[in-house]
Amino acid sequence: MEALLNSIPDYAKDLKLNLSAVLKQAELTEQQTWGTAVASAIASRGSEVTRAILAEAQLHLTPEALNAAKAASAIMGMNNIYYRFHHLSGNEAYSSIPARLRMQVIRTHGADPVDFELWCTAVSALNGCGTCVASHEKVLREKGMKEEAIIASVRIASVVHAVAAVLESEAAQRSL
């Protein structure tokens, strides 16, 4: 992680400091923190950020939790687009049409169900699906998770996403 932090340019110093801070939030367990970071890095599509976070996450997560975090990002990558269309179209008829999309991993991921739900919430926020955010956030609160913990995961998603964008733009500039 140190190499990743050092690769963040000076103009994004706030992001560098924020990344260090959001990975140490007291509101989240180690598994919640690193699962959120993994799911968010993958959803952000930044190869440098994803490599660094996956490498560090292996020190903090069981193989099952790591795979579940990856699965949360994968399934939300599909669901967030599908359900965002429902919301954005404004056409209620779409809600009555079966999705016909396989989503078994939501039940078979093998991680703590609340943690998986948290990772899905963070990725849904990152992907901008209001319907999915509302649905997952509601489940988390019903299962007893405090708003402070939920927003802590969204902090991770927002910072990881921003760092990924910065580093991808820096890589593009270097290739000029």
Language-model region placement:
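Hydrophobic alpha-helical segments
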Residues: 1-176
